[in-house]
Amino acid sequence: CGHATLASAFTYFNFLNPDAHEIVFQANRSEIKAVKANNGITLSLPKDEPRKILDLSTFSPALNAEVLEVYKGIDDFMVVLEDEAAVANNEPDFNLIKAMDSRGLIITAKGEEVDFVSRWYGPQTGINEDPATGSAHALLATYWSGIFNKSDLSAKQLSKRVGLLHCLVKEEKVDITGQAALYLRGTLQLN
């Protein structure tokens, strides 16, 4: 979802090669470039174009919420809710989400202090809710860029830990900037 890439880039830039400005990772489907930024690390992900889903019947029961629109990206469903409060207060049925044919389910709405807010549910992957899902923002930013008619977007993922991201939508890529912090440092001894 981007965590491992961001953490790897943070480790590379801060401990393995402090003079480096960028590193390229080979992901499942494409390369992901990580670049040092003034305010964190920018991951350049392939743009994910939303495809509108017309049958909304399974989404309202799974989310216990009124659903405005549903889209499908490469991996995830994306559900548009009424407002930030609907996203923040959502209490989903993870069993119904787990039965869906996708990696995960994103809920989103226009933000009050940022351009858009979201949450990402992925019980199919063993993670009921992810704190900050970089890969989901390739779809989210592409969608909201079209709604707001701008390419430079601020985002907040409303998980318990809250993730703040900056997204820049380009022709074929979405640049997502976030921050990483050193949590633990140690030595591993292998015998």
Where are the model-predicted features located?
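Active-site proximal loop and beta-alpha junction motif in alpha/beta enzyme cores
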Residues: 1-191
